[in-house]
């Protein structure tokens, strides 16, 4: 018999979605396996994969392998000892972006604390190869904190992505429990330095709620991000990937997410997505700056001509 606590935390109706595994989705998944590529959309069990891959022509590639050197207690990505770097991965990602005809691509990576450069050189080369082959596709990067190696960050920012995304994930108090190998202050410093290196590139971060934080702590995190010149914020519901991961302490209602979005915009964020199903890359194609939107427009014109 379920306990009272389990009854309260039963997944609410607004989190139950019908997955549309259409032919486009199945075909793209087959191509990923054939090219030995990984998307965080699949690895992290994102609920929006069908909308992004189909209707919005966006996808998030996970590079530097499929095994992470960290074991964050919210994340579904495999952890352990990673394989050797695949130096052909940048070209394969670029080719796949072209074949998928993506409007916007997010390039994320597992943490590679085992590498001297944290994987930054292969990461930057992936951005360059994608841009060479797909001049009208906007590129967002979502790196780890690179172990606090700011030479690695300089390498990444020199590749000139259209958005730099680095996730705060949770509030200050919960950070040691949620992601023990990262620190709250290092995340803020990473975001601040990114903006200092490339002031014209929008910076972005994401916050999960439902891990036991208070509303006041959420507002404090918003203030901390704005104090470090973060432009874009996404806020979504934490969902427990398995019983081995942290439990959900609270399910926020769509109305509560609406209020969080309003507060974020009032605090000065240029763009905020907030909702039960929102993830870091949700509607990412809408968050680029005006110069990047011009790329989208030119790309659409080229598509129509073809």
UniProtKB/Swiss-Prot annotation:
Any GO molecular function: lipoate synthase activity
Coiled coil: none
Protein keywords: 4Fe-4S, Cytoplasm, Iron, Iron-sulfur, Metal-binding, S-adenosyl-L-methionine, Transferase
Subcellular location: Cytoplasm
PROSITE patterns in UniProt: RADICAL_SAM (PS51918)
CC cofactor note: Binds 2 [4Fe-4S] clusters per subunit. One cluster is coordinated with 3 cysteines and an exchangeable S-adenosyl-L-methionine.
Enzyme Commission number, as recorded: 2.8.1.8
Pathway: Protein modification; protein lipoylation via endogenous pathway; protein N(6)-(lipoyl)lysine from octanoyl-[acyl-carrier-protein]
A Pfam family this chain is assigned to: LIAS_N
Residues engaged in binding [4Fe-4S] cluster 2: 68, 72, 75
Annotated positions binding [4Fe-4S] cluster 1: 41, 46, 52, 281
Domain Radical SAM core: 54-270
The protein's enzyme class: transferase
Cofactor: [4Fe-4S] cluster
A GO CC term attached to the entry: cytoplasm
Region named Disordered: 283-306
Catalytic activity line of the entry: [[Fe-S] cluster scaffold protein carrying a second [4Fe-4S](2+) cluster] + N(6)-octanoyl-L-lysyl-[protein] + 2 oxidized [2Fe-2S]-[ferredoxin] + 2 S-adenosyl-L-methionine + 4 H(+) = [[Fe-S] cluster scaffold protein] + N(6)-[(R)-dihydrolipoyl]-L-lysyl-[protein] + 4 Fe(3+) + 2 hydrogen sulfide + 2 5'-deoxyadenosine + 2 L-methionine + 2 reduced [2Fe-2S]-[ferredoxin]
Family the entry assigns: Belongs to the radical SAM superfamily. Lipoyl synthase family.
Protein name stated in the entry: Lipoyl synthase
Organism: Staphylococcus haemolyticus (strain JCSC1435)
Biological classification of the source: Bacteria, Bacillati, Bacillota, Bacilli, Bacillales
């Amino acid at each position: 018999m379920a306990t009272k606590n389990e009854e309260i935390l039963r997944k609410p109706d607004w989190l139950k979605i019908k997955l549309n595994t259409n032919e486009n989705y199945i075909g793209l998944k087959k191509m990923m396996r054939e090219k030995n590529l990984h998307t965080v959309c699949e690895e992290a069990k994102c609920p929006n994969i069908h909308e992004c891959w189909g209707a919005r022509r966006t996808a998030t590639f996970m590079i530097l392998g499929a095994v992470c050197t960290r074991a964050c207690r919210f994340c579904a990505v495999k952890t352990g000892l990673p394989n050797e770097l695949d130096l052909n991965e940048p070209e394969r990602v670029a080719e796949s972006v072209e074949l998928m005809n993506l409007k916007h691509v997010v390039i994320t990576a597992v943490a590679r604390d085992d590498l001297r450069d944290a994987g930054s050189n292969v990461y930057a080369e992936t951005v360059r190869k994608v841009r060479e082959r797909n001049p009208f596709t906007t590129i967002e990067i979502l790196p780890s904190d690179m172990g606090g190696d700011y030479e690695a960050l300089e390498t990444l920012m020199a590749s000139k992505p259209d958005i730099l995304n680095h996730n705060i994930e949770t509030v200050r108090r919960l950070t040691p429990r949620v992601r023990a190998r990262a620190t709250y202050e290092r995340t803020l410093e990473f975001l601040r330095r990114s903006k200092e290196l490339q002031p014209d590139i929008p910076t972005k971060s994401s916050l999960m709620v439902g891990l036991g934080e208070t509303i006041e702590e959420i507002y404090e995190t918003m203030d901390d991000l704005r104090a470090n010149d973060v432009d874009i914020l996404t806020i979504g519901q934490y969902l427990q990937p398995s019983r081995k991961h942290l439990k959900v302490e609270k399910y926020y209602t769509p109305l509560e997410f609406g209020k969080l979005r309003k507060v974020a915009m009032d605090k000065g964020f240029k763009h905020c997505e907030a909702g039960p199903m929102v993830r870091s890359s949700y509607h990412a194609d809408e968050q680029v700056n005006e110069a990047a939107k011009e790329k989208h427009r030119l790309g659409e014109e080229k598509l129509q001509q073809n």
